[in-house]
Each structure stands twice: as structure tokens, then as C-alpha cells.
């Protein structure tokens, strides 16, 4: 069964990177940091929830289509590192 399409809420943008909170419906799924290099794009995806391999691939494909390709359609590769963790707090 396919996972509901994710929603991405940008929390930060610089000249070469962006940070998005990832939601599935009203539930927070995690966060993704996207860094735009000259020829490739690197993503660090930190999940708050368990996803199946198929759901994870679906999410990565959606990240690529909605965030990466719209920013740089000519890039050669989107490289993603995935972590599973929990947010302990936000400090300033």
C-alpha cells in the first residue's frame, strides 16, 4: 500500500542549502537538509518514524521530484543519507 504523499515545510534557506520539516498528513515524519553542490545534491534525512523500504524510497523520490529537480533540473545525482532518531529539544 502506498504511503500518503508527504508535505515539506521549509524552515531555512541559504544560497546552497535548505532545511525542511517533513509531514505525512498532520504527523511529523522527520526533517531533511538539502545541500546543493556544483554537480550533485546531498540530502540528510532524519526520520522520527519507522518507514518500510518502499515508503522510504517513495519519500526519497518525492523529495527528488518536488525539491531537488525544481531547484536544479540539470544536476547529475541526488545522494541521500538516512538516519532514524528522535528530537530531544531545540536550543538557542
Outline where the language-model segments fall.
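Terminal leader/tail segments of proteins
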Residues: 1-24, 28-92
